[in-house]
């Protein structure tokens, strides 16, 4: 960790979505996103949907150019990881100031999305797909 980062206030948040887990740090800066040591644009393949999803909690509070986002994320795909980062950033902003909680909660940035892959059941081909039925 740089000596510059040690002197600044660091706010932590953890986010989860599907099988992705993101540990997010907010550091006072100019709005850069760094995910697993790579730039956010590069890591997310320049996908504007994922980038806007990550920036959404900061935009809700009008802080998009005030904090750098440093992320360690693992598991799942890019969409799950982007939503996990979004939730982690929102939780870190709540740590920054308790007043931030209400606007973030009304926008839905703090709630965990419970949807996950349904398990396969025995006797079926997939989670709900049954083998073809033959009457005779």
Curated annotation (Swiss-Prot):
Record's keyword terms, sorted: Ribonucleoprotein, Ribosomal protein
InterPro entries: Ribosomal_Su5_D2-typ_SF, Ribosomal_uS9, Ribosomal_uS9_bac/plastid, Ribosomal_uS9_CS, Ribsml_uS5_D2-typ_fold_subgr
Record bears the keyword Protease: no
Bias-annotated ranges (Basic and acidic residues): 98-116
Protein origin, superkingdom: Bacteria
Record GO terms (molecular function): RNA binding; structural constituent of ribosome
One BP annotation, GO: translation
Sequence segments annotated as region (Disordered): 97-136
Family: Belongs to the universal ribosomal protein uS9 family.
Name assigned to this protein: Small ribosomal subunit protein uS9
Organism of this sequence: Prochlorococcus marinus (strain MIT 9312)
């Amino acid at each position: 960790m740089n000596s510059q980062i040690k002197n600044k206030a660091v706010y932590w948040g953890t986010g989860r979505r599907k099988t992705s887990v993101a540990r997010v740090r907010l550091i006072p800066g100019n709005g850069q996103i760094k995910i697993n040591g790579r730039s956010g644009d590069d890591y997310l393949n320049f996908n504007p949907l994922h980038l806007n999803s990550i920036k959404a909690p900061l935009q809700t509070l009008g802080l998009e150019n005030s904090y750098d986002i440093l992320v360690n994320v693992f598991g799942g795909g890019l969409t799950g990881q982007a939503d996990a980062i979004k939730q982690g950033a929102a939780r870190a902003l709540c740590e920054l100031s308790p007043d931030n909680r209400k606007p973030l909660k009304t926008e839905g940035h703090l709630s965990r999305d419970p949807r996950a892959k349904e398990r396969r059941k025995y006797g079926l081909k997939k989670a709900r797909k049954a083998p073809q039925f033959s009457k005779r």
